[in-house]
Regions:
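Hydrophobic core of transmembrane alpha-helices in multi-pass small-molecule transporters
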Residues: 24, 93, 104-120, 145, ...
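Extracytoplasmic gate region of multi-pass secondary transporters
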Residues: 30-39, 213-276
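Helix-loop-helix hairpin linking two adjacent transmembrane segments in secondary transporters
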Residues: 103, 135-136, 143-195
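Intracellular juxtamembrane helix-capping segments at the cytosolic ends
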Residues: 41, 117-133, 328-333
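Flexible cytoplasmic inter-helical loops of multi-pass small-molecule transporters
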Residues: 190-210
Length: 333
């Protein structure tokens, strides 16, 4: 993102803390909700697993398509409109989700949620704090990923309880209220007076376009992009299917909720370990470990049904390996 003027760029603990709360709610109520409503959706709407999964895939596609324009809007100082609008859109779509009665309606809702995710999750808020705190953005990002990493720990049990108590439709409406009543006001109030682009660092549009194109076509950029795509295809796909996958493994409902919920806490541990590596070892060693930890965790999960009495220990091994790897990946990425 573009460097901003030095004016009003001192670190603000309160702003970062409240933005972190909004991240916790946004991740928990949108990204981690699908795995819990997949089963009820399929039963009530008569959908196959492929048809229900397509809804989440469409959301991810919509999020990806909006990533670049959202970044440009934030870079031009429209962060308040982007993130407040994204929270309102998320609330509207979650509320509409409670009224979904067809496959087409489900897909429309999740495309809208994909647009909302592009405007309210980590990527846009990281851009915001980088512009606001150019000399202290790392501290802000660390804080937000610590609290945001607990989204599954908080919201998977909460959403499961809401579904059991209210039904999945009213549960979605309750989650919608959090975006309208909490996230949208937070973004609207906190993100006033967006910093302006520094004139000293302004770049002619034509030169900026050529520079961007050169970077995007360079071998390092393409290799990093390939790595991120491959890793994210796993880290995004598994949470969406984890609850149903664990149920198919024959685990009890307590384990089914506890396992994905506990991954959030382990992710925070992974981020702490990353900073330990940075201080005491070569950070690139951690970068090389990440692609190993998560596949090993998946192998442990797949092998769990055939491990007999060690089944519980193997599942815990999956939680530890996957959680640490995914927690580190967020920071490194």
């Amino acid at each position: 993102m573009t460097t901003v003027s030095a004016r009003n760029t001192s670190y603000q603990v309160g702003l970062v803390g409240w933005l972190s709360l909004a991240q916790l709610i946004s991740w928990g109520s949108v990204f981690y909700t699908f795995t819990l409503i997949m089963g009820p959706l399929e039963r009530e709407l008569g959908l196959s697993r492929v048809e229900s999964s397509l809804a989440f895939s469409l959301a991810l596609l919509a999020e990806g398509l909006m990533a670049y324009p959202v970044g440009r809007w934030i870079d031009r100082g429209h962060e308040r409109a982007v993130m407040t609008g994204g929270s309102l859109l998320a609330g509207l779509c979650l509320f509409a989700h409670g009224w979904v009665a067809s496959k087409a309606g489900l897909y429309v809702v999740w495309v809208g949620l994909g647009f909302a995710m592009a405007a309210v999750l980590y990527s846009p808020v990281f851009a915001v704090v980088t512009r606001r705190f150019p000399h202290d953005f790392r501290r802000a990002i660390i804080t937000m990923t610590f609290l945001g990493g607990l989204a599954s720990t908080v919201f998977i049990p909460l959403t499961a309880w809401l579904i059991a108590d209210l039904g999945w439709r009213h549960a979605m409406m309750a989650l919608a209220a959090l975006h309208v009543a909490v996230c949208a006001p937070l973004h609207g109030v906190l993100l006033r007076n967006a910093p302006k682009r520094s004139a000293a660092h302004a770049t002619p549009q034509a030169h900026q376009g050529r520079s961007l194109k050169q970077h995007m076509l360079s071998a390092p950029f393409l290799l990093i992009g390939l790595f991120v795509v491959l890793m994210m295809s796993v880290t995004v796909a598994l949470p969406a299917h984890m609850v149903s996958l664990l149920r198919e493994h024959g685990l009890g409902e307590t384990w089914v909720i506890a396992i994905p919920a506990s991954i959030g806490a382990i992710q925070v541990l992974g981020r702490l370990l990353l900073f330990f590596f940075e201080r005491h070892f070569d950070l690139h060693l951690a970068n090389r470990l990440i692609p190993c930890l998560m596949p090993l965790g998946l192998v442990a999960l797949l092998a769990a049904p055939w491990t007999g009495s060690a089944h519980g220990a193997v599942v815990i091994l999956f939680v530890v390996l996957w959680g640490i790897g995914n927690g580190m990946l967020t920071i490194v990425k």
